[in-house]
């Protein structure tokens, strides 16, 4: 009989603990009403992303859609002043990085929404060069070599179904397929 009383007592303790836990959790709930935004507010939301510091860490390269479409901007770290570097009204331009040791800029963009993104170099005077000019080529920046004298990228220029890995010398702009 003593054993049966102990089992009943343990069962009551377990039930009491579960009921207490349930009541505690139930008392903690709050009614949440999410903020509602108009469609105008939703579309007026500016986005900023990416980010690459200049070698001297005085500038930050980003992309933003504050002009209505993504363009490349440069932010002065000391003042916070933002300078628009590209002025596209049609294609989105995405900041990649500064060319090592310079103020030249790498960015990517497609043409007319064809989703064949190329890698471009913007010189300090604002002129640009398509570094991956293949007509049906899609290219993506993959990083810098340790010595910062070459960049790596993937491209489907050999075969549209496959992306190969390339290394491009940033002094001669010649590329070689690695894999």
Model-derived features: where do they sit?
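Multi-bladed beta-propeller domains
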Residues: 29-48, 74-94, 112, 122-138, ...
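Conserved beta-propeller blade repeats
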Residues: 44-63, 89-109, 119, 135-157, ...
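C-terminal motif of bacterial Sec signal peptides marking the signal peptidase cleavage site
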Residues: 25-27
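AMP-binding (ANL) adenylation modules
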Residues: 66
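Bacterial N-terminal signal peptides that target proteins for export
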Residues: 3-17
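A detector of repeated loop/turn-to-beta-strand junctions in beta-rich toroidal repeat architectures
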Residues: 69-71, 116-118, 162-164
């Amino acid at each position: 009989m003593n054993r049966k009383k102990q089992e009943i007592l343990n069962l009551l303790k377990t039930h009491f603990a579960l009921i207490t836990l349930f009541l505690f959790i139930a008392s903690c709930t709050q009614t949440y009403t999410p903020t509602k935004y108009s469609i105008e507010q939703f579309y007026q939301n500016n986005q900023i992303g990416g980010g690459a510091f200049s070698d001297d860490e005085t500038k930050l390269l980003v992309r933003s859609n504050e002009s209505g479409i993504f363009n490349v901007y440069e932010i002065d770290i000391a003042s916070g002043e933002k300078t628009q570097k590209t002025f596209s009204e049609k294609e989105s331009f995405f900041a990649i990085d500064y060319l090592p040791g310079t103020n030249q800029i790498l960015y990517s963009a497609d043409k007319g929404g064809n989703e064949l993104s190329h890698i471009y170099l913007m010189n300090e005077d604002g002129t640009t060069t398509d570094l991956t000019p293949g007509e049906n080529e899609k290219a993506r920046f993959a990083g810098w070599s340790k010595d910062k004298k070459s960049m790596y990228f993937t491209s489907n220029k050999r075969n549209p179904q496959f992306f190969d890995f390339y290394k491009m010398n940033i002094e001669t702009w010649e590329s070689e397929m690695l894999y």
